Curated annotation (Swiss-Prot):
Pathway, per record: One-carbon metabolism; tetrahydrofolate interconversion
Domain of life: Bacteria
InterPro entries listed in its UniProt record: Aminoacid_DH-like_N_sf, NAD(P)-bd_dom_sf, THF_DH/CycHdrlase, THF_DH/CycHdrlase_cat_dom, THF_DH/CycHdrlase_CS, THF_DH/CycHdrlase_NAD-bd_dom
Keyword set includes Amino-acid biosynthesis: yes
Record's protein name: Bifunctional protein FolD
EC number: 1.5.1.5, 3.5.4.9
GO cellular component: cytosol
Function per UniProt: Catalyzes the oxidation of 5,10-methylenetetrahydrofolate to 5,10-methenyltetrahydrofolate and then the hydrolysis of 5,10-methenyltetrahydrofolate to 10-formyltetrahydrofolate.
Binding site for NADP(+): 173-175, 198
GO molecular function: methenyltetrahydrofolate cyclohydrolase activity; methylenetetrahydrofolate dehydrogenase (NADP+) activity
């Protein structure tokens, strides 16, 4: 491809555009029900990074006219105490979405607590039941980062007359909240999907076959740009702070002359993650309003 031809998939700009749409949908819910959509965020312990993420999610709620209830619990919290709090929120009709901020202190059974969240309020897409339903093509809220990536790609594909069907998609990474659901979503969209991970042999060969490449492995610039097929659509879900700002899991410097489209780091996938959480909470509120 010629130099500097790739489309920059600007997640920050799209998230801002979607927030305008969500504000209108929130206003419609309030007008219909007299109740403001509410996201409950549970923060266990005092991890500063987690507190920052929760604050960012609360700010995103405010921007679209939603409310955010912040539930703070001490680091000494037990699994039973956290399960009781989740049950309380499950049974509160004013709460439309529940987010348990990861990670929780090591004495807590995180999976049991995730799975205790009501499926209708699992707007972060963390329950095993929700993942199973999504895998079977049944309605469920997807894990926010891969769902945000799909939305970003759908907008780009629709604008450019591209279809997912038949594309070779390669996902590098197999985490429960990113790699696995990402692969399943691409499969649901009729892509031919390959999942690569730390035990994969000949990673370069797999990457080189990708029409759609998703880097979700958590290793700085593990995937080299010269492995990438010309004309591929490149999605980098990684972020690793550096003195210059940060890098992802894919070597992006010079990617403009190789890829058809790519997500920048930062400003690509990250903004879509929180945006998807808010969008799915609005959807939950809309469904509750129709019940």
């Amino acid at each position: 491809m010629n130099d500097a031809t790739a489309t920059r998939l600007d997640g920050k700009a799209l998230a801002k555009q979607i927030e305008t749409e969500l504000s209108q949908r929130v206003a419609a819910v309030i007008k219909k029900t007299g109740r403001t959509p509410i996201l409950a965020t549970i923060l266990v312990g005092d991890d500063p990074a987690s507190a920052t993420y929760v604050r960012m999610k609360g700010n995103a709620c405010k921007r679209v006219g939603m409310e955010s209830i912040r539930v703070e619990m001490p680091a000494s919290t037990t699994t039973e105490q956290l399960l009781a709090k989740i049950d309380e929120l499950n049974n509160n009709p004013d709460v439309h979405g529940i987010l348990l901020q990861h990670p929780v202190p090591e004495q807590i059974d995180e999976r049991a607590c995730f799975d205790a969240i009501d499926l209708n309020k699992d707007v972060d897409g963390v329950t095993s039941l929700g993942f199973g339903r999504m895998s079977m093509g049944e309605p469920a809220y997807g894990s926010c980062t891969p769902q945000g990536i799909m939305y970003l790609l759908e907008r780009y594909f629709l604008k450019n007359g591209i279809e997912f069907a038949g594309k070779n998609a390669v996902v590098v990474g197999r985490s429960a909240i990113l790699g696995k659901p990402m692969a399943q979503m691409l499969l649901n969209a009729n892509c031919t999907v390959t999942i690569c991970h730390s035990k994969t042999q000949n990673l370069e060969e797999h990457v080189g076959r990708a029409d759609i490449l998703v880097g979700a492995v958590g290793v700085p610039e593990l995937i080299k740009k010269d492995w990438i097929k010309p004309g591929a659509i490149v999605v980098d879900a990684g972020f690793h702070p550096t003195e210059d700002g940060g890098v992802g899991d894919i070597e992006l410097k010079g990617i403009e002359s190789i890829a058809a489209a790519y997500t920048p780091v930062p400003g690509g996938v990250g903004p879509m993650t929180i945006n998807t959480l808010i969008r799915q909470t609005v959807e939950a509120a809309e469904k509750a309003a129709q019940a």
